[in-house]
């Protein structure tokens, strides 16, 4: 269910609130504020990475506000506020350095690099708190690697993922 951002209650003189007003002021607002996750995606097919490469998410798990653009692989914020963007991926190549990079409206935010020591160790993740303007700012998951490698989608815990959660206005 898609919920709207909370409205500031208005109390006109001589107006007695109705039960539906309390629903709008209290229940709908709390529902919106506690829902938090506004977008979740995964990639189930393999992709080759080299340098900074946008991750081509192909499985959308949650998108109640219809912000995902499948052709440009970006998610647009539906309303202004603070969001937490988290993402991660795994690679199956040893001795390669990799990094999960959140990108907000074309600006990349590099966090921390991971050097893969074996084909079974190659996961990385990042988290970013960002202020975004509704209908304008967008999020894209990017991976950086020091050499040409493939993303590891061999098991459930290794698939690339992106999650955006609403924090506050």
Q: Where are the language model's segments positioned?
A:
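Solvent-exposed serine/threonine-rich low-complexity stretches and specific carbohydrate-binding patches
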Residues: 110-119
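Short, surface-exposed tryptophan/glycine-enriched loops
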Residues: 106, 120-140, 146, 153-155
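General beta-strand recognition
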Residues: 84, 110, 138-140
């Amino acid at each position: 269910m898609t919920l709207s951002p909370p409205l500031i209650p208005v109390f006109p003189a001589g107006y007695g609130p109705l039960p539906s007003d309390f629903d709008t002021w209290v229940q709908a607002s709390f529902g919106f504020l506690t829902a938090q996750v506004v977008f979740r995606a995964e990639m189930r097919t393999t992709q080759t990475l080299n340098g900074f490469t946008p991750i081509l998410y192909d499985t959308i798990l949650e998108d109640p506000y219809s912000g995902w653009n499948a052709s440009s692989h970006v998610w647009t914020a539906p309303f202004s506020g603070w969001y937490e963007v988290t993402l991660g991926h795994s690679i199956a190549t040893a001795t390669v350095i990799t990094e999960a990079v959140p990108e907000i409206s074309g600006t990349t935010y590099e966090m921390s690099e991971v050097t893969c020591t074996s084909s079974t160790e190659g996961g990385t993740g990042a988290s970013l708190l960002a202020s975004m303007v509704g209908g304008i700012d967008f999020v894209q998951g990017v991976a950086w690697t020091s050499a040409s490698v493939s993303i590891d989608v061999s098991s459930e815990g290794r698939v690339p993922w992106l999650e955006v959660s609403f924090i506050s206005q």
